[in-house]
Amino acid sequence: MTMTAADIRLRQNPILTALLLGMGQGTMVAEKLFPRLPQVLSSVNLAKLGDERLRRYNLRRAPGGPTKRVNIKFEGATYSVDQYSVEVPMPRELLREADESRKLQVGNYLDVSRIAMTTASDILGLDYELEVAALATNVNTYASGHVLALAGATKWSAATGTPVTDVRAAADTIRKKIGKRPNRLTLSADAAHALALNPQVKSYLPTTVLGPASVEQLKTILQVEEIVIADAVWVDETDTGRDVWGNNAILAYVPRISAGGGADISLAEPRSEERRVGKECLRLCR
């Protein structure tokens, strides 16, 4: 029998490159909208103050007269964290095989331990992203007047759409509600595409700019400190890829949370975080 290439390799099939085919994932932005609390406990008591410092009082007094006393409202609420978990089993024999291949430097090999850990991490991250997106794009999450539904000629993808007017009006609504201007605009992939090519947006650009508006230009035009584009996708039961964030835009004030106390991990679960973190959003539905 004539010897074949497989016989020369003793019928082994080495991995000849360091490449591994697989599906990638877009940018996940859940923590940009609902930041994790630096909290390692599964239950926490959160203090909440009233709006006393935003109200006006009659502070005028006669010499020696009584001063105005303002009582601070304090509300303490206890929140618990739900747990999520996933298993990606990997036979011990395969782990040992990869371990020995690495020690013996037998060509390239699959780092199955890393693949399993990355897969589990990505699954948990996508589940978190989906839950946050469902909460943030639900009209029932917001107060009356804080959701703008666009259709037909008002859509940002339409030539007559007015995203600059919409975003600036939404920013003013948030400012009047909480006393702070929104600092973050979260855009789905579709919303970002429509916004960058919108005629009203391009009218703010120099005449020398022929292409779509960049993120930096959009930040200046819309007067928003940060713009994040949500590219994450998920595959449904029909094997169809779908955008996690649909065609939505969410304008919000997101507080900056430092890791006070040196905590470097968080057990916070998306739904609990939304209730824990004080913020105000106005959703713009494209």
Give names to the regions the model predicted.
Residues 92-100:
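Acidic/histidine-rich, surface-exposed loop or edge segments in extracytoplasmic proteins
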Residues 99-181, 189-204:
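Alpha-helical scaffold segments that mediate packing/assembly in large oligomeric complexes
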Residues 180-272:
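Extended oligomerization regions of viral-like shell subunits
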Residues 122, 215, 276:
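Short, cationic low-complexity segments
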Residues 1-38:
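N-terminal alpha-helical "arm" segments
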Residues 274-286:
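Single conserved hydrophobic/aromatic residue that forms the stacking wall/gate
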Residues 23-91, 118:
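Assembly/oligomerization interface modules of large self-assembling protein complexes
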Residues 10-13, 37, 56-57, 257, ...:
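Positively charged, low-complexity intrinsically disordered regions
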